[in-house]
Amino acid sequence: MSALVPPVLLASSSPSRGRLLSEAGVPFTAAAPGVDEQAIKASLKAEGVSARDAAIHLGEWKARRLSLAHPQALVIGGDQIAAIDDLWLDKPGSLATARQHLLLLRGRTHVLETAVVVLRDGQRLWHHLARPKMTMRSFSDAFLEDYLDRAGAGITACAGAYQIEGLGLQLFAAIEGDLFSIQGLPLLPLLDFLRPHGVLLS
């Protein structure tokens, strides 16, 4: 890569976001963002910030520390919040909470507020918000218990308690939105942003 092309850093511990960038051929280095995500979310909720704005703020905060530590780098931050009505659904953290979330979402449509933000030298250069609409089918209690048993602890770190690229697909009757955004990264708009910076060929 030319010395004139800025390095790309992904401020995320998410395997899904890293996998999407790798599969798209984006040269990048991943690093943990080093922020207290739950404390930031609690503060934003207390301030009455909407889920869509919170996703953008969280993506930016995740990228900021790395951006200040790596001058000239393009630092990508992202966040995803499942929202239904005015309620945010945080990552469940346990299978018991995952069950509660899925019972709430069953037979209803929720939105995945999915933000990606790019910073350089601590300043936001660009952001994009995707809002996939996810309609869960009215699955049976037996299906729910089988799903929780088979999906296991991995879903406790996922917004909405599912991974669409796996068993979670069986939860849904309909989706509106691209699969990249549903998996946590609005990839096509991000690639469009990176091209003029020389990271990818136009």
Curated annotation (Swiss-Prot):
Which cofactors?
Answer: a divalent metal cation
Sorted alphabetically, which keywords does the UniProt record give?
Answer: Cytoplasm, Hydrolase, Nucleotide metabolism
Q: Name one GO biological process term.
A: nucleotide metabolic process
Gene Ontology CC terms: cytoplasm
Under Enzyme Commission nomenclature, its number is: 3.6.1.9
What molecular functions are annotated in GO for this chain? nucleoside triphosphate diphosphatase activity
Report if keyword Ribosomal protein is assigned. no
Q: What does UniProt give as the signal peptide span?
A: none
* Subcellular location field: Cytoplasm
Q: According to its UniProt record, which reaction does this protein catalyse?
A: a ribonucleoside 5'-triphosphate + H2O = a ribonucleoside 5'-phosphate + diphosphate + H(+); a 2'-deoxyribonucleoside 5'-triphosphate + H2O = a 2'-deoxyribonucleoside 5'-phosphate + diphosphate + H(+)
InterPro entries assigned to the protein according to its UniProt record, in alphabetical order? ITPase-like_fam, Maf-like
One family from Pfam that matches here is Maf
Q: What does UniProt list as catalytic?
A: D79
Going by the entry's taxonomy, the superkingdom of the source organism is recorded as: Bacteria
* Family, as annotated: Belongs to the Maf family.
User: Which HAMAP family does the UniProt record give?
Assistant: Maf
Function noted in UniProt = Nucleoside triphosphate pyrophosphatase. May have a dual role in cell division arrest and in preventing the incorporation of modified nucleotides into cellular nucleic acids.
What this protein is called in its record is: Nucleoside triphosphate pyrophosphatase
Q: The organism's lineage?
A: Bacteria, Pseudomonadati, Pseudomonadota, Alphaproteobacteria, Rhodospirillales
